[in-house]
């Protein structure tokens, strides 16, 4: 999925899955110059800061759904 410039793809509270770290919850995300920095809390791996373009995160659900 391509990202629209200036728009965050990940929202606080969103459940995601990472191929190495497993399932986690987005704590925060912020746009950088040309990417999105996503902070995710993984139950067994701690809190990780990931660059969206490299992380390969799979969205599991939307917050509030």
Residue ranges and their predicted role:
Residues 1-15, 63-64:
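Mixed-charge, Lys/Arg-rich low-complexity intrinsically disordered regions
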Residues 21, 43-45:
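Glycine-centered tight beta-turn/hairpin loop motif at sheet-sheet or coil-to-beta transitions
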Residues 33-39:
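Short aromatic-glycine-enriched beta-strand elements
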Residues 22-30:
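Short beta-strand-centered aromatic/proline hotspots
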Residues 15-23:
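Short coil-to-beta-strand transition motifs
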Residues 48-65:
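Intrinsically disordered, low-complexity, charged/polar segments
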């Amino acid at each position: 999925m391509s990202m629209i410039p200036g728009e965050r793809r990940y929202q606080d509270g969103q459940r995601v899955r990472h191929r190495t770290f497993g399932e986690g919850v987005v704590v925060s995300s912020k746009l950088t110059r040309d990417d999105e920095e996503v902070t995710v809390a993984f139950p067994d791996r701690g809190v990780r800061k990931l660059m969206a373009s490299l992380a390969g995160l799979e969205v599991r659900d939307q917050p509030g759904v």
